[in-house]
Amino acid sequence: LRDLGYDVERIEKRARTRIRYTQKKFSPQRQLAATAALEHITAIMADGLLRNDAYMADAHPALARLWRWHALEETEHKAVAFDVYNQVCGSRKLLRRAMLMGTFFFVLDTTRGLAHMLKVDGLLWNWRVWRDGIRWMWGKEGVFRPLISAYLDFFKDGFHPWEHNNLDLLHATREEFDGAPLIQAGAA
């Protein structure tokens, strides 16, 4: 990304600053609630990626494989922080508030990163790029639209991440990687 002109250090610094602030100002229970909430977001995104090959259809094969592996990893541990949180604290109110705040900052930070990359590419003010991007994310066949229901499930009383049972998908995807290194020598 640096070679393409993106200021990776700036993006990483913003993330480090947010993490340090959270560690300084938030209780351990609130930090754990935020982790559980954000893990739900990454889990439902991972599920979407694993279910829809079209999302990575135009990606370089090594990059597509890396993203599938990462989605697999996110799926495997999707309930760990949630289960620990329930044992340690268990407040649904705090968990819901953490999801709302986590969602806000997730959207804010990813939009800032996207805007930086579009600016570097000279596309920040290209309305067609924004229109097409919004359609790709939220349109009828968009990436995020199918995730709305799973996202909202988090706010239900008694919800647990494994209620979105995708063990079949997890096992099928794991078969792609068992016995094979993520990036083989000479690949890429």
Where are these regions (language model features)?
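Non-heme di-metal
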Residues: 1-188
